[in-house]
Curated annotation (Swiss-Prot):
One of its GO terms (cellular component) is proton-transporting ATP synthase complex. The chain crosses the membrane at residues 22-42. It comes from Chlamydomonas reinhardtii (Chlamydomonas smithii). This is ATP synthase subunit b, chloroplastic. It is found in: Plastid, Chloroplast thylakoid membrane. In plastids the F-type ATPase is also known as CF(1)CF(0). It is a single-pass membrane protein. CDD domains: ATP-synt_Fo_b. The gene is atpF. Keywords: ATP synthesis, ATP-binding, CF(0), Chloroplast, Hydrogen ion transport, Ion transport, Membrane, Nucleotide-binding, Plastid, Thylakoid, Transmembrane, Transmembrane helix, Transport. Belongs to the ATPase B chain family.
Amino acid sequence: MVFLPDNILILGHGGFGFNTNVFETNIINLAAVVGIVVSFVGKNLSSLLEDRKNTIVKNLEEANQRAIEAEQKLTAARTQLETAKKKAQEIREEGVLRATQEINNVVSQHELRLARLQEFKQETLAFYQQKAFKQAYLYVINKIMTRVRERLNKGLDSTYHVVVNNFYVSRFTQF
């Protein structure tokens, strides 16, 4: 082996030269390695990249589908909320209506009871008034009857005899 001043190593006659210049050698070696890697690994790498691309596209489509489903569910939930609000408003209005009807019903029943109570009061007053008149009438009649008996028991004098006779005569003339 002979070393030449140009940094070329010659192996035998017409042999193979090896460049020992580091920068030039590294660039050549790097190009050779990249060429080998691209030729052998390129198909596999492009296949891996295509698979990854398909996976990403599939994930994006699934995410888009989930977003659409979520939007539909949100729309359905909003619709249900509006329906529930309407139903609650109807129930509230019905409750107010029923409460008003119940209040009116109670007021009318109360007025009927008051009217019956007033009627009962008037009947009671009339009854006690009749009772008082009857008692007064009986008292007056009893007093009159007592005085008549006393007069009859004492005997009639001429003035009373004339009054009694006139009474009977007036009664007979009325018939």
